[in-house]
Amino acid sequence: MTKSWIIKQHRDSFFKKSKVLGYRSRSAFKLIELNQKFKFFKNKINLLDLGSSPGGWSQVASNFLKKSKILAVDIEPMERINNVSFLKGNFLTEDIKDKISKEFIGKIDVIISDMAAKTTGNKSLDCIRTNELCMEVINFSSETQFGWPQNDK
């Protein structure tokens, strides 16, 4: 992190608000806004948060979904959040897919993801890598659309 990036963050109103409200990331407000528009947080659902660390979106989900099953998955560690189970690993590997399947024993109702690829400094390459990650989430969600697993083969 550069000094100019840190200064920019501290001037950002969402950064400040996230710290006051105890959210781990400013992106928590994106998810709150999305839910206000699309109302996908309904009581008693199975929710999967892919690319969850540092946990801002999982925090929001936990606040809205007190009686739901929430599983957060990331290759990076994540500090504990009430009402959220955490699985460290890559959701694209068979081992982690099996663990996700066992965790939900039934269908996944909602998948959320705010993943981005590690940046290289090359904006074009970073964009391509992040788009590839998004496509992997879409492919994963189509596998689990009507329960686990979705086998059309």
Q: How does the language model describe each region?
A:
Residues 1-43:
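Class I SAM-dependent methyltransferase Rossmann-like catalytic core
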Residues 41, 64-65, 104, 144-147:
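A generic alpha-to-beta junction signature in SAM-dependent methyltransferases
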Residues 43-53:
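Conserved class I S-adenosyl-L-methionine
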Residues 54-66:
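Conserved SAM-binding loop of SAM-dependent methyltransferases across substrates and taxa
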Residues 61, 100, 137-141:
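Class I S-adenosylmethionine-dependent transferase superfamily signal
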Residues 68-71:
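Short beta-strand element of Class I
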Residues 75-120:
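S-adenosyl-L-methionine
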Residues 106-148:
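Mobile active-site "lid"/loop adjacent to the S-adenosyl-L-methionine
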